[in-house]
Design a protein with these regions (language model features):
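C-terminal alpha-helix
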Residues: 109-121
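Conserved catalytic-core segment of NTP-binding enzymes
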Residues: 1-79
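Short, contiguous clusters of charged residues that form electrostatic/catalytic patches at enzyme active sites
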Residues: 25, 29, 105-112
């Protein structure tokens, strides 16, 4: 909870599994408590779907998250990728371990989406 007290915003990764949705409700409750008491400026940056595979279950979870959270759900998803798992064992971030890996491309796409959202938010606040 300390980190949420000091943060401006939080990016919430959501594993594309149903049990993750249960944990998500607990996290959202914690964020609400922090926002109502210790840090009223805390915002949710967005919900990032992770460990995504193209199967029915993952598609259902992704659809639920997008329907429930709307524009707060990032368009970018982080696909399950072996290179993402290998990179830490080599002491490297995935971008340095294998820049062409699906996971690297996904994270680069996420970075671009974040920048685009923040530029848009900055314009709207002026």
């Amino acid at each position: 909870m300390n980190i949420l007290t000091a943060a401006d915003s939080v990016l919430i990764p959501v594993q594309c599994e149903y049990l993750a949705l249960e944990g998500l409700s607990k996290l959202l409750n914690t964020i609400k408590i922090v926002k109502n008491g210790l840090n009223p400026d805390l915002d949710i940056e967005g919900f990032l779907l992770t460990m995504y595979m193209r199967n029915r279950l993952n598609n259902q979870v992704a659809t639920e998250v997008r329907q429930h959270f709307g524009e707060l759900a990032f368009d970018t998803v982080i696909q399950r990728n072996i290179r993402l798992g290998e990179a830490p064992s080599h002491g490297k971030p995935v971008m340095l371990y294998d820049a062409s890996a699906t996971g690297s491309v996904n994270y680069l796409t996420l970075a671009k989406e974040l920048l685009k959202r923040n530029r848009k938010a900055t314009k709207n606040n002026k």
